[in-house]
Amino acid sequence: MAHRLVEELVREGVIKSESVRRAMLAVPREEFVMPEYRMMAYEDRPLPLFADATISAPHMVAMMCELVEPKPGMKILEVGAGSGYQAAVCAEAMERRGRVYTVEIVKELAIYAAQNIERLGYWGVVEVYHGDGRSGLERHAPFDAIIVTAAARQIPPALVRQLKEGGTLVIPLVEHMGQILYKVTKRGERVEKRAVTYVLFVPLRES
C-alpha cells in the first residue's frame, strides 16, 4: 500500500528526489495515526489525531520535505510535531545523519510524538520538545531549514533569526484568499518569499 501511494506521488511530480521517495517508503505512516484510522494510513488525506490536531496528508508531508531539500548533516527545526511523522520522514531523507528538532505546543501531543519517535527507533536523530514553536529553539540554532506545520498570520521573527544564511523556511500563511504555502529563503537582513500552492492547515496556536 505504501509503495502504491509513493509511486503515485512520484507520477504526480510531488516526490522529485530519490531521498524523499526512500523516506516515504521507509517510514510506516500507520504507526503515526490513531488506531481507528490505521486502515486509512495510505490514503492521501489528513487524518485526525486528538486535541484538534491532524496528521498531514502524505502528499503535503512529501512536498514540505522536498522544499527543504534534506541532506545528511543538516539541522532541521519543525514547528508542530503532531504525531512525529513529518519529523521521521525528514530524518530518513537525511539518511538518519543529521538532527530534527520538533516543537509541539500541546503537551499531550508532544508526549505522543516522543513515544512514537522512540518506539520506532528515531530517538537521537529526532528530538521532541514541548513549547511554543513560534519562539523557535534558540539553544539549537541556527538551523539549515525550518518547517512549520500550522498556518500563521505572519512569519514569526524568531524563526527568521534562527535560520542560517541561505536557509529555507517552509510555512503556510493565512491571506485574504485563503492559506498559501511559502518557501522562504534568508538573504542577509531580508527574506525572499515564493508562493508554492494553496493549502489548508490547522491554525498555529499561541501559548
UniProtKB/Swiss-Prot annotation:
Active-site residues, record numbering mapped to chain:
S56
The principal localisation class reads cytoplasm
Q: Name one GO cellular component term.
A: cytoplasm
Record's keyword annotation contains Isomerase: no
Which InterPro entries does the entry mention? PCMT, SAM-dependent_MTases_sf
What does the record give as the function of this protein?
Catalyzes the methyl esterification of L-isoaspartyl residues in peptides and proteins that result from spontaneous decomposition of normal L-aspartyl and L-asparaginyl residues. It plays a role in the repair and/or degradation of damaged proteins.
- This chain's protein is named Protein-L-isoaspartate O-methyltransferase
